[in-house]
């Protein structure tokens, strides 16, 4: 005889008397041990669960029917569950009953946010099968009331040790389900972490198609409101990591219950909840939960005792968190600084980068700990530190030198690709580790077979950007090996990758014939220009300039039809001060030109005309009457700190190429550092530029002394 589970509004008024939805789950478990059921779960389009329940072999108590009148309506009350007896009396088989169960909060459609069409769980089945979950319970009439048949509670750790696959865990659940269901999800995730990627994908497919998986998901939703909060969080984390989509009813229900019970969070739960939020993709329920999490952290931040928990919370708080909350967490971390372990100090860089908070005090103190314990530092830690420094724009020269010196000292134990990755990160920071780069060049020359297409491009970009091959002893060997390796990939390389490689060679003032000739083909040039990428146009302009100004006579000088590039904008603040200093030094603005645009899209901030010995400045009005052979053109460039390698006066690739090309156009180049000029008083600035502009022979003795102190 069928017993149908209907919405509460369809039963008698008397059944509405109890509104405690939480008690329903406890009674439902008790009821399920007394009644053997076969449930068919159907999901409507709103995501509301409407199960049909079939009861058979009713035997609640052997002598229960002896106490009932056959003509009366019997009501068996489990708070929210009512059983009405028909006029045929109680029977042990074939009883006709109607059970009205109320599901008010957990699965009520209006109380949940959904991003898209929902399903309980994702299964590789047809649409009809996705809407249906069959749950079967077989309980013996003789054993339902005996303690001996009650399954023993099993921990997730024991499950993960006894089972070898995800399906084994589900088999264990189907044989004897125990509370809480979170143990099964946690055990499956523990097992999945031990598997390879291919095994993990295969096991997940088996998990989704397992007959007991949907039953486990339903148990998880039923128990979400009554299990311990930490188990709820453990299960949510495991479910997300197992790859169950977030837009399923299961995940969204657990998110909603987690929101409702967030005040139960203790320090351990804060750590787990942080990990859960970090693993989840943005959605409405995640946003609401993250907002509640931030409020909770703001209230409990001073109560956090474990440093690791504090760092996990800080990492999860988000880049868009209120600045007041970030500063409060920073103050808490500073209070705990004496308790930081080496691992805590190493991890702090990544934590601050995750919350986009540049705390110089924390970074400086942690840098000291990292340097003091640099030996044995794993590559992963060094990569995280360098990447975080880039994100935070934190340039600690001592830290970078210490890391580079450690890698150079242990160079023989590092694999080729690991050293290259470290060098790429250093290039991103603008730092030039001379010793390490020399060792890496030597390895490339000795073992060119280790080069492939990807690392060829990375090496060329790194060395050209940092201008490292300039005046190196083995420059010729290095660039020849790189050119030879690139030539071997010309038949498979893409046009953009070829352009990147050739541009790097241009910066290094080296022009291998085969790559250049292939790039200069008209069809490849047209392909690069049709992409509407201004970077391609800029690099082609650079190539065209090198063909005209550098020593490339053996290459074909093709007239390239290139789009016009936007003009470079000068730094108005610094240029104004330099213009004032030049006017005071040279005797008026008639002795220099400002904002001069040259051929090949080059720009200089100031131009001065002098005699060939740079002893005398010539007024601009007298230049036309003087032979060009008697004039020395002086280009004054106002450059930023980023134009140099970090912590040095070594120019980076583009500035070095620009100086080379200006020299080819007949200019004597003077570099004026913006940050230094801003700090100088007018008198000191005049003296500084005087020593730069005039030759040593033309300076008075006092000026020479000033120059020697710079």
Swiss-Prot record:
It comes from the Eukaryota. The modification Phosphoserine is found at residues 126, 140, 708. Expression detected in spleen, thymus, testis, ovary, colon, heart, smooth muscle, kidney, brain, lung, liver and white adipose tissue with highest expression in heart, smooth muscle and thyroid. Its main location: mitochondrion. GO terms for biological process: apoptotic process; mitochondrial large ribosomal subunit assembly; mitochondrial RNA processing; mitochondrial translation; positive regulation of mitochondrial translation; regulation of mitochondrial mRNA stability; RNA processing. Plays an important role in assembly of the mitochondrial large ribosomal subunit. As a component of a functional protein-RNA module, consisting of RCC1L, NGRN, RPUSD3, RPUSD4, TRUB2, FASTKD2 and 16S mitochondrial ribosomal RNA (16S mt-rRNA), controls 16S mt-rRNA abundance and is required for intra-mitochondrial translation. May play a role in mitochondrial apoptosis. This is FAST kinase domain-containing protein 2, mitochondrial. It comes from Homo sapiens.
């Amino acid at each position: 005889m069928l017993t149908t589970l209907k919405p509460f509004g369809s039963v008698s008024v008397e059944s509405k008397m109890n509104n405690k939805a939480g008690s329903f789950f406890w009674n439902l478990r008790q009821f399920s041990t007394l009644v053997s059921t076969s449930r068919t779960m159907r999901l409507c389009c709103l995501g509301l669960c409407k199960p049909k329940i079939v009861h058979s072999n009713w035997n609640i108590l052997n002598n229960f029917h002896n106490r009932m009148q056959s003509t009366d309506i019997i009501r068996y009350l489990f708070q929210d569950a009512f059983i009405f007896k028909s006029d045929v009396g109680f029977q042990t088989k074939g009883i006709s009953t109607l059970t009205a169960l109320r599901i008010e909060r957990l699965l009520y459609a209006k109380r949940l946010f959904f991003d898209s069409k929902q399903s309980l769980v994702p299964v590789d089945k047809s649409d009809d099968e996705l809407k249906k979950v069959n749950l079967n319970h077989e309980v013996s009439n003789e054993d339902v009331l005996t303690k001996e048949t009650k399954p023993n509670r099993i921990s997730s750790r024991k499950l993960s040790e006894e089972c070898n696959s995800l399906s084994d865990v589900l088999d264990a659940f189907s044989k004897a389900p125990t509370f809480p269901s979170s143990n099964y999800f946690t055990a499956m995730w523990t097992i999945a972490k031990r598997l390879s990627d291919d095994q993990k994908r295969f096991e997940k497919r088996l998990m989704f198609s397992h007959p007991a998986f949907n039953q486990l998901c339903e148990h998880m939703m039923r128990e979400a409101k009554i299990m311990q909060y930490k188990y709820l969080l453990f299960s949510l984390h495991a479910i997300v990591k197992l790859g169950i989509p977030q837009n399923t009813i299961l995940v969204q229900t657990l998110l909603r219950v987690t929101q409702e019970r967030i005040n139960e969070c203790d320090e351990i739960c804060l750590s787990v909840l942080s990990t859960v939020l970090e693993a989840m993709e943005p959605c409405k329920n995640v946003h609401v939960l993250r907002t509640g999490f931030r409020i909770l952290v703001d209230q409990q931040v001073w109560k956090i005792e474990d440093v690791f928990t504090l760092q996990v919370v800080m990492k999860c708080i988000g880049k868009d968190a209120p600045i007041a909350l970030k500063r409060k967490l920073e103050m808490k971390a500073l209070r705990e600084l004496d308790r930081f372990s080496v691992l805590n100090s190493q991890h702090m860089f990544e934590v601050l980068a995750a919350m986009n908070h540049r705390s110089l005090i924390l970074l400086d103190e942690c840098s000291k700990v990292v340097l003091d314990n640099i030996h044995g530092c794993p590559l992963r830690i060094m990569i995280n530190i360098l990447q975080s420094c880039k994100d935070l724009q934190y340039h600690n020269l001592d830290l970078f030198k210490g890391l580079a010196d450690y890698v150079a000292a242990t160079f023989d134990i590092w694999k080729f690709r690991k050293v290259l990755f470290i060098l790429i990160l250093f290039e991103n920071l603008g730092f030039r580790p001379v010793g390490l780069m020399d060792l890496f060049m030597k390895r490339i020359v000795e073992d060119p077979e280790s080069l492939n297409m990807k690392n060829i491009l990375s090496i060329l970009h790194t060395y050209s950007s940092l201008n490292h091959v300039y005046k190196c002893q083995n420059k010729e060997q290095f660039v020849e090996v790189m050119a030879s390796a690139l030539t071997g990939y010309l038949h498979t390389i893409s046009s953009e990758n070829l352009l990147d490689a050739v541009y790097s060679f241009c910066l290094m003032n080296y022009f291998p014939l085969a790559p250049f000739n292939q790039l200069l083909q008209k069809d490849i040039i047209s392909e690069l220009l049709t992409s509407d990428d201004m970077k391609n146009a800029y690099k082609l302009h650079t190539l065209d300039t090198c063909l005209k100004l550098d020593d490339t006579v053996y290459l074909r000088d093709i007239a390239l039809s290139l789009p016009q590039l936007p003009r470079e904008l000068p730094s108005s603040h610094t240029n104004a001060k330099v213009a004032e200093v030049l006017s005071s030094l040279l005797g008026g603005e008639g002795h220099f030109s400002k904002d001069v645009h040259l051929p090949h899209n080059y720009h200089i901030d100031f131009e001065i005309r002098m005699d060939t010995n740079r002893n005398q400045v010539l007024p601009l009005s007298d230049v036309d009457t003087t032979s060009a052979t008697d004039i020395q053109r002086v280009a004054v460039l106002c450059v930023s700190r980023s134009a140099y390698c970090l912590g040095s006066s070594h120019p980076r690739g583009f500035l070095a190429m620009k100086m080379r090309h200006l020299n080819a156009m007949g200019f004597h180049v003077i570099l004026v550092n913006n940050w230094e000029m801003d700090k100088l008083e007018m008198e000191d600035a005049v003296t500084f530029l005087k020593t730069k502009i005039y030759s040593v022979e033309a300076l008075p003795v006092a000026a020479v002394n000033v120059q020697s102190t710079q």
